[in-house]
Amino acid sequence: MNPTTRDITLELPECATWEAGQYALVRVAPFEWRPYSLASAPGRTVRLLVDVRTKGMGASWASAIAAGDDVDLELPYGHWLVTTDRGTTDTEAPYRRIFIATGTGIAPFLAAFEAGRRDDDILIVGYSRTEDDLTGRVDTPLPRLIRCVSRAAAPGTFHGRITDYLNAEGIDPQATYYVCGSARIVRDISRIIQAGGARVSYETF
């Protein structure tokens, strides 16, 4: 996917069901399991996005896995759900949805977009560098996209962190915000959203 992220698709022996926001447990070593967000809609295949910069057992497994390898996994787990409002029109849906992700935190949102996007959905992503941006490398149809790049300015992006963008543009109190990413960043983003009077649901990794 890029030098820091592996995009892994696993074929299941039979169709499985899960909700956007849930995760799978993957055996990455004989006695070690790691949780990874499910990045695809339910079905016969499972998509995982794995950050390999950590150099841990999960990163080593993701770096070494090859086509045809057998993988032990269990799913689904988790109670953090990203509502898809399936069968609901934009007019009927109670709240606008704004998704915010850093790095592989985009994974559960990809599952949500596969299950059903709405015309008023917004996806805000944050990266240090443009080469870390995953949105141009996924085949999942995305909603309106806002990219925040904190280092060098780039055309078509907001120059700064996601927190800078939210402070500059303001919070929509009529929206529901879904936030996923590293704990510190998610905490800072959630505080801004809550201070703006909006609903926020978040998950960290």
Where do the model's predicted regions map?
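Ferredoxin-reductase
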Residues: M1-E74
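FNR/FR-type flavoprotein reductase catalytic core
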Residues: M57-F205
